[in-house]
From Swiss-Prot:
Part of the 50S ribosomal subunit. The keyword Protein transport does not apply. It is found in: Plastid, Cyanelle. Keywords: Cyanelle, Plastid, Ribonucleoprotein, Ribosomal protein. Belongs to the universal ribosomal protein uL16 family. SUPFAM superfamilies: Ribosomal protein L16p/L10e. InterPro entries: Ribosomal_uL16 (IPR047873), Ribosomal_uL16_bact-type (IPR000114), Ribosomal_uL16_CS (IPR020798), Ribosomal_uL16_dom (IPR016180), Ribosomal_uL16_sf (IPR036920). This is Large ribosomal subunit protein uL16c. One of its GO terms (cellular component) is cyanelle. It comes from Cyanophora paradoxa. GO terms for biological process: translation. One of its GO terms (molecular function) is structural constituent of ribosome.
Length: 136
């Protein structure tokens, strides 16, 4: 699963997801892509599950690029712990995804195959997505 090797700070504040994605919102590497339509935190497990689903469907046919990286730590307190005594330990990593952000790109496969692979991958993600193509 994806996670940063090292970070400047162990814990982060939650922040908020306002507006649309101004960066990473068009295709760069592949011919087809999966674009987010809603804001969400996508965990490294969800990214890995969708990557595996795409790989399983495409087999050795195409090349896949993951355009998001989980670089935000989410902390959790142990169950049944009293209030106070600081912030919990980092539990998992998430990628902040805003509407318009390209999540995956794929190359070397037909449009029908790419569409079907991304459809399977979408079921693993907590957001609505849309299929985009660089071909006109």
């Amino acid at each position: 699963m994806l996670s940063p090797r090292r970070t400047k700070f162990r814990k982060q504040q939650r922040g908020r997801m306002k507006g649309i994605s101004t960066r990473g919102n068009n295709l760069v590497f592949g011919d087809f892509g999966l674009q987010a339509l809603e804001p969400a935190w996508i965990t490294s497990r969800q990214i890995e599950a969708s990557r595996r689903a795409i790989n399983r469907y495409v087999r050795r046919g195409g090349k896949i690029w993951i355009r998001i990286f989980p670089d935000k730590p989410v902390t959790m307190r142990p169950a049944e712990t009293r209030m106070g005594s600081g912030k919990g330990a980092p539990e998992y990593w998430v990628a902040i995804v805003k509407p318009g952000r390209v999540i995956f790109e794929i190359n070397g496969v037909s449009q029908e195959m790419a569409k079907a692979a991304f459809r399977i991958a979408t079921f693993k993600l907590p957001i609505k997505t849309k299929f985009i193509s660089s071909r006109v």
